């Protein structure tokens, strides 16, 4: 599916390629990727290309000379008013003023489907995100991962992919053993027994709360069980409670998963064992000091890794390899993991293991997410005033609301550290970016209430002369609306939701400027109708963009 700006861009790109062939700079079968996009400076036109600079090596001429020759052969589309050569050899395209009014009937005809793409048609993608240990509560870093993963899944769905959201439950291994022992210790303490708390146990208040809930439900029912059996029984109940708490926190944050995948199930089904056996058969395992080692160095890694300890217990790495094998065996074309930046060393290890198993490691994409810091009153907030421990996602949402939290978490690139300004997120002013965007939508709905009071209805688009929209404020808003599908494509291909957050903030800015300088009601009839249709097109895009972010579009503020 191609939209107005994409069609124009495609037409110009084709014309540039043909000009390069006619000028002898390219052979007809040559493939050359060149940029043709909106320049950063408005003075440089509507689209700019670096094609001339990419042809210097083959043409053996300077880029400005190449650009001049290209212009001699260029078929200029009707929408283009003029073409200029700038700087070292950029070719800038300036469109006629009225080209962009055609975006209004396009948006109105597509409605909520405006911006939907087919770049992912027929492809299945899995996005695995958060996957926090179920031994504690979700913190702010998990919140950033939740917003990033959920919004990215929304964007990929809009780009035509079939998307599955997945949470990997780390319910096996040493951490669960320590968790079980911690719950048992707190349980026994609450029942009046003196116990030594496990050295590597979990000390959080939430573990005491969990143990208290178990005592309230079951009393001393587990006291007389053998120690190991008691630990497992208590741990199982506690883990289920923790998992339900995590699910509730995420649902409150607007995140719902398609699959909750248990690490324990990989061990119980024998998948870990089968994966280890397959690596052995493919010649990538060897025995040393009684343990089984993965010969990762054969495939370029710095060192080999233990997969099965000498006591016969598989490592976490072995389970993780089995999990990723399972993902690809489920038929996903692309597997996306969202991990904290502290996992960066694990990325190449996982890709190497997939290669050893015979899978294409390029089908695994790992997004590494940087840390979040919370600020209030200009100072770093390290601990919750309420609990004296780390600040949970629930506490943050209670403080600023879902809308602000989700927006703030994705308004910076995932690979940049995020300083979350608590005061700004709560502010009801134009300084708060999410408020600023939502206020644009609320202003539109307020205008519609005025229309309703005055008996004004939305006119059929074919009855309105849209060319009357010619002021700078109107044209800037129209151009930005035309860029919406391009932004979705950019977000989907770069796996970068922050572009959508930025786009909506800019769109709100263009709308507020238009609203403050162009009256919609009480002006000449055709102008009023044209502006009303522009407002409706803006409403559709604003509402859809906010929905993709999982942020509400209020009717009143």
From Swiss-Prot:
InterPro entries: aa-tRNA-synth_I_CS, Arg-tRNA-ligase, Arg-tRNA-synth_N, Arg-tRNA-synth_N_sf, ArgRS_core, DALR_anticod-bd, Rossmann-like_a/b/a_fold, tRNAsynth_Ia_anticodon-bd. Keywords: Aminoacyl-tRNA synthetase, ATP-binding, Cytoplasm, Ligase, Nucleotide-binding, Protein biosynthesis. It catalyses: tRNA(Arg) + L-arginine + ATP = L-arginyl-tRNA(Arg) + AMP + diphosphate. GO terms for biological process: arginyl-tRNA aminoacylation. Gene3D superfamilies: Arginyl tRNA synthetase N-terminal domain, HUPs, Isoleucyl-tRNA Synthetase, Domain 1. It holds the Pfam family DALR_1. It is found in: Cytoplasm. The keyword Ligase applies. A motif ('HIGH' region) lies at residues 132-142. It is an enzyme of class 6 (ligase). Its EC number is 6.1.1.19. SUPFAM superfamilies: Anticodon-binding domain of a subclass of class I aminoacyl-tRNA synthetases (SSF47323), Arginyl-tRNA synthetase (ArgRS), N-terminal 'additional' domain (SSF55190), Nucleotidylyl transferase (SSF52374). GO terms for cellular component: cytoplasm. Transmembrane segments: none annotated. Its main location: cytoplasm. GO terms for molecular function: arginine-tRNA ligase activity; ATP binding. PROSITE patterns: AA_TRNA_LIGASE_I (PS00178). Monomer. Belongs to the class-I aminoacyl-tRNA synthetase family. This is Arginine--tRNA ligase. The lineage of its organism: Bacteria, Bacillati, Bacillota, Clostridia, Thermoanaerobacterales.
């Amino acid at each position: 599916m191609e939209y107005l700006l994409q069609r124009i861009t495609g037409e110009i790109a084709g014309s540039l390629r043909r000009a390069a062939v006619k000028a002898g700079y390219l052979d007809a079968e040559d493939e050359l990727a060149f940029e043709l996009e909106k320049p950063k400076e408005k003075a440089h036109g509507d689209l700019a290309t670096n094609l001339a600079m990419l042809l210097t090596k083959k043409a053996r001429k300077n880029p400005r000379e190449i650009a001049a020759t290209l212009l001699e052969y260029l078929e200029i589309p009707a929408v283009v008013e003029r073409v200029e050569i700038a700087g070292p050899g950029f070719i800038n395209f300036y469109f006629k003023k009225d080209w962009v009014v055609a975006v209004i009937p396009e948006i109105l005809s597509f409605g909520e489907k405006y911006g939907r793409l087919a770049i992912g048609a027929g492809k299945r993608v899995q996005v695995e995100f958060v996957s926090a240990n179920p031994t504690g509560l979700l913190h702010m870093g998990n919140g950033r991962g939740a917003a990033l993963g959920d919004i990215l899944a929304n964007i990929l769905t809009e780009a035509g992919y079939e998307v599955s959201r997945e949470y990997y439950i780390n319910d096996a291994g040493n951490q669960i053993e320590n968790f079980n022992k911690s719950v048992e210790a707190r349980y026994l303490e609450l029942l009046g027994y003196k116990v030594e708390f496990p050295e590597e146990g979990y000390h959080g208040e939430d573990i005491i709360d969990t143990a208290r809930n178990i005592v309230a439900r079951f009393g001393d029912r587990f006291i007389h069980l053998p120690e190991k059996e008691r630990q497992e029984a208590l741990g199982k109940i506690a883990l289920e409670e923790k998992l339900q708490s995590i699910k509730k926190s995420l649902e409150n944050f607007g995140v719902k998963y398609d699959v909750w995948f248990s690490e324990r199930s990989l061990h119980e089904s024998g998948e870990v064992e089968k994966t280890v056996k397959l690596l052995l058969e493919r010649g990538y395992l060897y025995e040393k000091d009684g343990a089984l080692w993965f010969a990762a160095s054969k495939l370029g890694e710095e060192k080999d890794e233990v997969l099965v300890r000498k006591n016969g217990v598989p490592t976490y790495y072995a389970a993780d390899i089995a999990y990723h094998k399972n993902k690809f065996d489920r038929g996903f074309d692309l597997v996306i993991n969202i991990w904290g930046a502290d996992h960066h060393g694990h990325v190449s290890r996982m890709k190497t293991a997939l290669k050893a198993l015979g899978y294409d490691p390029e089908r695994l994409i790992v997004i590494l997410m940087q840390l979040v810091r919370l600020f209030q009153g200009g100072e770093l907030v390290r601990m919750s005033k309420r609990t004296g421990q780390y600040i949970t996602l629930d506490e943050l949402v209670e403080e600023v609301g879902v809308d602000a939290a989700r927006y703030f978490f994705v308004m910076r690139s995932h690979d940049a550290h995020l300083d979350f300004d608590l005061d700004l997120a709560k502010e009801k002013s134009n300084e708060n970016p999410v408020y600023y965007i939502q206020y644009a939508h609320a202003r539109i709905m307020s205008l519609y209430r005025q229309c309703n009071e005055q008996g004004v209805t939305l006119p059929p688009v074919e009855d309105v002369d849209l060319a009357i929209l010619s002021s700078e404020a109107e044209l800037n808003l129209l151009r930005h609306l035309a860029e919406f599908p391009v932004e979705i494509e950019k977000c989907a291909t770069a796996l970068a939701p922050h572009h959508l957050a930025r786009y909506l903030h800019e769109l709100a800015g263009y709308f507020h400027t238009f609203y403050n300088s162009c009256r919609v009601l009480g002006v000449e009839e055709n102008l009023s109708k044209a502006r009303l249709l522009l407002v409706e097109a803006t409403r559709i895009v604003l509402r859809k963009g906010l929905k993709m972010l999982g942020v509400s579009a209020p009717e009143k503020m």
